[in-house]
């Protein structure tokens, strides 16, 4: 992109003057961030407009990625780097006596996602634009994100993530493209105003969906794709009559109900109202997005919908947007008078589905009454899809009534969204080799028998532009100095680093880069959280969504083990470690919140005990998010990837850590298996039961956690300390549910369903291997270099090329 320094200065000062009535000397940090971002957007805008123009001038097949979340992180540095103007902007700001780092730190993380699902979507958008494929995202513009996590008295407390308090300078509101989404109402059949016999809805609640567009800037080219986010409002808005009647609450009731749809990501759904709000969100996203797509198709191509799959492929990111399938049927049949068979043909050639989990709880299903009341016409269509599908199932599995019932899209009083997706989509992919194998052989075995041609694997990836080039500039420079440029868009080139594995100078430099990053993180935590950590210790890190299967509890048990050993045995002298945690627990997930409380309680005990000072430290990083990950990951020595084998679909933090030279301590789960295959077992620390072993134990019902407590007094002591009324909690009740979930089982489940006690000894042994390996500085550095050199497979660029080859069949569009 062309950069004119004087024009940039003029735009920046003009923005300050017009927007805030200030000059640079009067501007606040936020004013400067807004002005710098707006001025950068001015440079990006011509390419953004030209990208859209070329896509429309010569219609070509485009990907549309529907996702409940996009965990974008900060936009400023990423966009400047991808646009190739990062250094120039820094230089101009320096001339203007503006500190770029202060400007960058003023940007909030976009509150559009939470975990790996959303971060994957963000990486995919980056790769699509960089590889010059026509691909855009559709999501919801959440006003308050999921939540901002504060730790108070060791416990997670949720506050609104008010990331839009100042508006986002990177978004462009498109009121001209607003659409109406309808809920409820009564189904009618008869003549419409144009004389056609169709189904239609009367007395529906109408919600206005207004799009806000964000630019997705490709690296080193002119492509700027779009992430379109929908905001919900009421077309009626404020009721002045009710207000004048002094009914103030009722005057804004409709407005509030509408705006609640795009208020918060993943509202607590423990009750029926929360479930209904989630379904409203999902239908709102899909209906608005499909109306938008179909409107543009009719405008540019016409109403021959048999051509629709030639120009569109829609990827459903997990089950959240699966209601798009019956919604497209509704639009085609009810609004364009297309017949059922023709509509179904379009749907089954357009939609593809990515499965991200084998956890039954995450395969969404909706109570029939909720679904039917909220979306009566959509439910009617799902009923008909299911009726026709059951003929197919009975033909494939005659006489097997249990299987027929289980595979019903509607059964046991619920609508099964994953079943609907697998039936309707032409492709169903898992996200790591093990995950896809388990789907085909275990969780979705019946479906794989019915539709073997649909199932395929696409191992996840991450974008090296954000997770290496931007977040670890010293390491990026180290790489470029040795192998040149090109790795930024072809990460397989990192393989050339292997020839430096025994080069003393390279290993010394790698050690120093890691130390510098550790120093920076220590300094950041000192100033942001008032936490002191020693950057000469091993940084052992587990940062990810808090869930029992991810086994943060196993990690803290090992820390409790180390603490007990150090206190009880003066001769026990392990290497000094700093354990870093970062995680949010879902607001309604009680045991996950208890684990956060336990981590912070143990951390507090350790920091106040002089006997372990300098040997052991635990830090829980508050409000973990992308911008924090960009500081933590480059500084980490050990990457904790310790989920119960067979439960983590893929994971992507494991890839980011590998790319940044942290060694994997993990189970043979998700993408860990492929990481170990790439880097070599000798360059990782693998432990624990395998997925096959766990499947066998589950099938035999042979697991007895008590035997692990009986044979390991250290483990028995740790588990007992949860409830002994003296070590960590005077009442003995604070961690009672965690204790009982391991020893007795809770909520009708058997004890220790995630095999924490079974894997404890192996985990401790693996940690001892980590300690021993770390003592050999050069040997450790060699392992890190080999990990970096073999991380090329885990670029999202490779993942996107796999999707394009096997599923999407897109053609590159070179923007002039």
Task: Tell me what each language-model feature is.
Residues 1-816:
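A conserved ligand/cofactor-binding region detector
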């Amino acid at each position: 992109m062309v950069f004119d320094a004087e024009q940039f200065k003029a735009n920046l000062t003009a923005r300050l003057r017009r927007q805030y009535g200030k000059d640079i000397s009067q501007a606040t940090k936020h004013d400067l961030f807004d002005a710098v971002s707006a001025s950068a957007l001015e440079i990006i805008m011509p390419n953004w407009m030209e990208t859209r123009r070329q896509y429309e001038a010569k219609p070509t097949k485009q990907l549309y990625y529907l996702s409940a979340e996009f965990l974008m992180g900060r936009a400023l540095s990423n966009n400047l780097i991808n646009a190739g103007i990062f250094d120039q902007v820094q230089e101009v700001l320096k001339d203007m006596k503006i500190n770029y780092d202060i400007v960058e730190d003023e940007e909030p993380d976009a509150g559009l996602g939470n975990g790996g699902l959303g971060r994957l979507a963000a990486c995919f958008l980056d790769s699509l634009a960089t590889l010059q494929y026509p691909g855009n995202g559709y999501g919801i513009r959440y006003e308050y994100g999921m939540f901002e996590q504060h730790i108070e008295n060791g416990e997670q407390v949720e506050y609104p993530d008010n990331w839009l308090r100042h508006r986002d300078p990177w978004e462009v509101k498109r009121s001209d493209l607003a659409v109406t989404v309808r809920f409820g109402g009564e189904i009618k059949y008869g003549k419409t105003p144009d004389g056609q016999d169709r189904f239609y809805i009367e007395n529906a609640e109408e919600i206005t969906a207004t799009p806000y567009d964000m630019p997705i800037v490709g690296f080193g080219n002119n492509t700027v794709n779009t992430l379109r986010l929908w905001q919900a409002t009421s077309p009626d808005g404020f009721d002045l009559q009710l207000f004048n009647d002094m009914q103030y609450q009722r005057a804004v009731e409709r407005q509030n109900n509408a705006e609640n749809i795009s208020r918060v990501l993943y509202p607590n759904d423990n009750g029926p109202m929360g479930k209904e709000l989630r379904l409203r969100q999902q239908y709102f996203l899909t209906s608005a997005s499909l109306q938008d797509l179909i409107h543009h198709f009719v405008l540019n191509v016409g109403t021959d919908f048999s051509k629709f799959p030639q120009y569109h492929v829609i990827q459903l990111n997990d089950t959240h947007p699966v209601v798009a399938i019956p919604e497209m049927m509704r639009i085609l049949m009810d609004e364009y008078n297309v017949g059922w068979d023709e509509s179904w043909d379009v749907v089954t050639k357009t939609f593809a589905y990515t499965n991200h989990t084998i956890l039954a709880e995450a395969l969404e299903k909706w109570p029939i009454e909720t679904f039917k009341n909220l979306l009566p016409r959509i439910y009617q269509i799902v009923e008909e899809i299911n009726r026709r599908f059951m003929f197919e199932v009975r033909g494939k599995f005659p006489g097997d009534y249990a299987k027929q019932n289980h595979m019903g899209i509607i059964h046991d009083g619920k609508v099964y969204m994953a079943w609907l997706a697998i039936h309707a989509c032409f492709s169903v992919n898992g996200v790591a080799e093990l995950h896809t194998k388990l789907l085909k052989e275990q969780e979705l075995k019946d479906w794989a028998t019915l539709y073997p041609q649909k199932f395929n694997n696409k191992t996840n990836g991450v974008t090296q532009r954000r997770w290496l080039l931007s977040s670890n500039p010293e390491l990026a420079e180290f790489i470029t100095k040795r192998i040149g440029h090109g790795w930024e868009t072809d990460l397989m080139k990192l393989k050339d680093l292997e020839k430096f594995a025994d080069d003393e100078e390279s290993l010394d430099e790698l050690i120093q880069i890691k130390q510098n990053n550790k120093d920076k993180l220590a300094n950041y935590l000192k100033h942001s959280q008032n936490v002191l950590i020693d950057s000469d210790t091993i940084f052992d890190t587990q940062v990810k969504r808090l869930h029992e299967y991810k086994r943060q509890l196993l990690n803290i048990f090992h820390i409790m083990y180390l603490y007990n050993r150090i206190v009880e045995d003066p001769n026990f002298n392990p290497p000094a470690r700093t354990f870093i945690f970062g995680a949010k627990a879902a607001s309604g997930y009680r045991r996950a919140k208890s684990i956060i409380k336990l981590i912070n309680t143990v951390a507090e005990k350790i920091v106040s005990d002089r006997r372990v000072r300098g040997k052991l430290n635990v830090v829980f990083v508050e409000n973990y998010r992308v911008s924090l990950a960009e500081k933590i990951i480059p500084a980490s020595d050990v990457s904790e990837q310790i989920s119960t084998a067979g439960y983590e679909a893929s994971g992507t933090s494991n890839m980011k850590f590998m790319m940044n030279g942290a060694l994997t301590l993990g189970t043979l789960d998700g993408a860990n298996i492929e990481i170990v295959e790439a880097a070599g077992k000798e360059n990782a620390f693998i432990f624990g039961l395998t997925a096959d072993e766990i499947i066998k134990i589950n099938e035999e019902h042979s697991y007895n956690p008590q035997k692990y407590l009986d044979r390991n007094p250290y483990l028995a002591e740790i588990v007992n300390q949860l409830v002994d009324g003296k070590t960590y909690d005077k009442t003995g009740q604070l961690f009672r549910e965690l204790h009982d979930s391991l020893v007795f089982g809770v909520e009708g489940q058997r004890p220790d369903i995630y095999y924490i006690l079974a894997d404890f000894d192996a985990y401790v042994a693996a940690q001892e291997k980590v300690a021993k390996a770390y003592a050999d500085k050069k040997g450790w550095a060699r392992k890190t270099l080999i990990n970096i050199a073999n991380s090329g497979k885990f670029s999202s660029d490779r993942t996107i090329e796999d999707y394009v080859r096997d599923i999407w069949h897109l053609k590159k569009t070179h923007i002039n």
